């Protein structure tokens, strides 16, 4: 017989229902408290001291005396290879250890940290939603990245554009010779080599991307004025990159975007972003017109002078370009490749020359290697570079000490653990590449510039590359968002530096014969703070 509980004025309830309900409630409470207790027990990385109310460790980003990666490197010495800092109300896990990097990006885990933090500059100036540099990870990003890597920046593609790269390099070296010879004294000439590197790398990449020719006026690129569209793009890009270095309040406190609006920062970002898109739009339209006029020359449109824009237009014509606005996607790719490729490559060359000038015995050894393998009757060619093992070691050592991407900034796609420490979905991760590449447990005498460290005791070169396979050496980044233009940059660096060493005698212009190695205060990029002034003279 079913048992009932009878209460006055209440309909009788079967005891079985009460029992099931009671057990269910107890189970639900047990699960709730178990989950809550588990969350409480999740291990968190140690919190760095010194956080201020409301803003946390924000002062580290606003420090105009020390780069962020150095400040975080000093904190790693105190708190260990993983610790938390707070930026506003956002907690950031900072890792400075190659084993933890391997956990984040090794094997199948590289997808975990494949998103990036949005920024004010990306939103208003860099076409955030259509750029592979800032678009969220997903089908659109994967398709865009595939086009960049396979059709623009692959080894085969770069080989087809090699003649354009060489033409611009030849023009830049001719200009350097001209500057040296114009003083009429036969003595060394004072040259701002950081500026020369910047001009060379922009000219090379702009020639590949949209057909820009330095030292001349291409009718396709002139605006009817004395200045080509390529030159306008370069000047506007320099201003835009300067704006990116200005701290934006809303990058930390999104609700305070109105502050950046009042400061005029958003207005200026929009202005330069619109100008860059406008110039790129003209370049795209001119390429379209040239392709229509050259229909008889097949799909290339411009014959042997095909460039990146031509390839992207071909992809768009086949409806293979992702997104709803093909022109905006192409504009974004132009901006991403030109800005990302020229500035970082010139910075790598600048640091390499700084180190060589401060270590004349290394420079002397590099010259001897060049004289042995190349001789003195011709300049260095791309086919020579694999044989220049010591110069290749110089380049690796320079990138170890002064990596362009000194800090990687990523967001977790899902909840995970790094080094046993909990990272929530959407959690922010800083990878201190600069610190990892100076880790004394990996690198002997890590602060020394020593190209010889890249050779084994038997003289064979070490099997360590910068393609993300070796987690202790990641100057081009790591994971799915590592530098797409790594191969292009590597080719330029490995040809420009030996050609410069081979063709010119150089020494620091300072009274003490040393180059100032101070770094510019900033967040993620390792730039030289002061100009690189060098006394340059063509070798006899």
Curated annotation (Swiss-Prot):
Enzyme superclass (EC): oxidoreductase
Primary location recorded for the protein, binned into one broad class: membrane
A GO-annotated cellular component: membrane
UniProtKB keywords: Alkaloid metabolism, Heme, Iron, Membrane, Metal-binding, Monooxygenase, Oxidoreductase, Transmembrane, Transmembrane helix
A GO biological process held by the record: isoquinoline alkaloid biosynthetic process
Pathway: Alkaloid biosynthesis
Role played: Cytochrome P450 involved in the biosynthesis of the benzylisoquinoline alkaloid noscapine. Converts (13S,14R)-13-O-acetyl-1-hydroxy-N-methylcanadine to (13S,14R)-13-O-acetyl-1,8-dihydroxy-N-methylcanadine.
Stated name of the protein: (13S,14R)-13-O-acetyl-1-hydroxy-N-methylcanadine 8-hydroxylase CYP82X1
